[in-house]
Curated annotation (Swiss-Prot):
Tree of life domain: Eukaryota
Protein's name according to its UniProt entry: DEK domain-containing chromatin-associated protein 1
Molecular-function GO terms, alphabetical: chromatin binding; DNA binding; histone binding
Broad class of where this protein is predominantly found: nucleus
Lineage: Eukaryota, Viridiplantae, Streptophyta, Embryophyta, Tracheophyta
Residue ranges of the region described as Disordered: 18-91, 212-390, 438-462
InterPro entries: DEK, DEK_C
Biased composition (Basic and acidic residues): 20-32, 277-303, 312-322, 347-360
DEK-C domain location: 384-439
A single GO BP: negative regulation of DNA-templated transcription
GO cellular component terms listed in the entry, alphabetical order: cytosol; nucleolus; nucleus
Length: 462
């Protein structure tokens, strides 16, 4: 049975095997033909044959290379915006023919307000180069009779959209007289529109001529001022030097008064004779130093005049020389003040017994000066303090103040602030009061030391 079935099936198997072999052979032939065709074929790029690389069939399928297509935009022709603007003659005069408007336009630079004005006038934007030229050629809106109302309404809307400051700027450029503080925005828009419909000169005064006149006046005044300053400079500097000398002279006079009072008080005492000699020597020294300072200032003034005439040195060097001379004179007078105050303090500290008698005799002298002080106080409307009041306040100030840093001017300021009166004219009297107060304070300290020593001795005895 098995042999019979095999014999029956063999013709069918043979038929199927033959069909499969034919299919494989046809496939191989087709692939070989394709490979040969691809090798022979070439892609033409720019007139040249380019053979694509051949890869074996077993690895990957073959792909045809595609040609790159570039996307190019056709540029349209340039718009007509670069064409010159056609300006037709309006109802009024051209803005460049109105002198004030032309003058203001010449002073202005292209800015946002001018660009906005150009768009309102012509409905188009303009380049910065042609901006002022186009505005100057404007002579009024050109509207047809049929569309006049519509065009006027459009122009009014454009002006209403602008800020008040811009409308004021338009009025300034177009020389429209306006009260900036009280005018309203609506009124500004109406005035600008009326002017632009028919531009005309608003006033007869020419701004260019008025500004030229003002410039001429300024130049003439500046020349006069410079000439006046050049002629009066030495006189001014002399005045300044004199002013600097005045306070030093007053200080010297105060010191001389102190010296004279000291001499009058010491007539009845034999011990005070050397004080008089010292005070006289101090006065002579101060006078000599004043004379030297005056001679220095005079010499500096002569040098300045000679330098001005010859024009050898600049003004800066002159000012330096003035400042140097003034500073030197101030330093010299300050040194004199310090030396006099220190010497007077030492002399009066050594002579404690005579200080009490001086206090009695000096009370009579301020009464003579009191008449002058009362005259000044009557003019000012305030009563000046007496010597006793000054003495009390000075002692309080001296207890609070450091002797190393405090000066006479500081004490005078504190006294003035306390009494509400300027006491610079009583400088010499205040100086005497200060010395008396210092002596009293030193006496009190000595008495305290003696009391403490006595108490210590008593305790030691006990």
């Amino acid at each position: 049975m098995a042999t019979e079935t095999l014999e029956l099936k063999t013709p069918q198997l043979a038929d199927t095997v033959a069909v499969t072999e034919k299919d494989t052979e046809t496939k191989k032939k087709d692939e070989v033909e394709k490979d040969e065709a691809m090798e022979e074929k070439g892609e033409e790029i720019d007139g040249e044959k380019v053979k694509s690389p051949v890869t074996p069939v077993s690895e990957r399928p073959i792909r045809e290379r595609k040609r790159t297509g570039r996307y190019v935009i056709d540029t349209p022709p340039r718009s007509s915006g670069n064409k010159p603007l056609s300006i037709t003659q309006g109802r009024g005069t051209r803005l460049k023919e109105i002198p004030n408007v032309a003058y203001k336009l010449s002073k202005r630079k292209p800015d946002d307000n001018l660009f906005l004005l150009h768009t309102i006038l012509y409905g188009k934007k303009a380049k910065a180069q042609m901006l002022k030229k186009n505005i100057g050629q404007f002579s009024g809106f050109v509207w047809s009779e049929q569309e006049e109302e519509k065009q006027r309404a459009k122009a009014k809307e454009k002006l209403d959209k602008c800020i008040k400051e811009k409308l004021i700027d338009f009025c300034d450029v177009l020389d429209i007289p306006v009260n900036k503080s009280t005018v309203k925005k609506e009124e500004l828009a109406v005035r600008v529109l009326e002017f632009l419909v028919c531009p005309k000169a608003t006033r007869d005064i020419l701004l260019a001529d008025s500004e030229k006149e003002t410039k001429k006046r300024k130049k003439s005044t500046s020349k006069n001022v410079t000439s006046g300053e050049s002629s009066h400079v030495p006189a001014k500097r002399r005045r300044q030097a004199k002013k600097q000398e005045q306070p030093t002279e007053t200080e010297g006079n105060g010191e001389s008064d102190v010296g004279s009072e000291g001499t009058n008080d010491s007539n009845g005492e034999d011990d005070v004779a050397p004080e008089e000699e010292n005070n006289k020597s101090e006065d002579t020294e101060t006078e000599d130093e004043k004379d030297k300072a005056k001679e220095k200032t005079k010499s500096t003034d002569k040098k300045r005049l000679s330098k001005r005439t010859k024009k050898e040195k600049p003004a800066a060097e002159e000012e330096k020389s003035i400042k140097g001379s003034a500073k030197s004179s101030r330093k010299s007078f300050r040194q004199v003040d310090k030396s006099t105050t220190s010497s007077s303090k030492k002399q009066k500290v050594d002579k404690d017994d005579s200080s009490k008698e001086k206090g009695k005799t000096q009370t009579s002298k301020p009464q003579a000066k009191g008449s002058k002080d009362q005259g000044q106080s009557r003019k000012k409307g305030k009563k000046e303090p007496t010597r006793k009041e000054l003495h009390v306040v000075v002692t309080k100030i001296l207890k609070e103040v450091d002797f190393n840093t405090a000066t006479l001017s500081d004490i005078l300021r504190k006294l003035g602030s306390h009494f509400g009166i300027d006491l610079m004219h009583r400088k010499a009297e205040v100086k005497d009061i200060i010395t008396d107060a210092i002596n009293e304070m030193s006496d009190d300290d000595d008495e305290k030391e003696e009391d403490t020593e006595d108490e210590g001795e008593k305790e030691g005895k006990d």
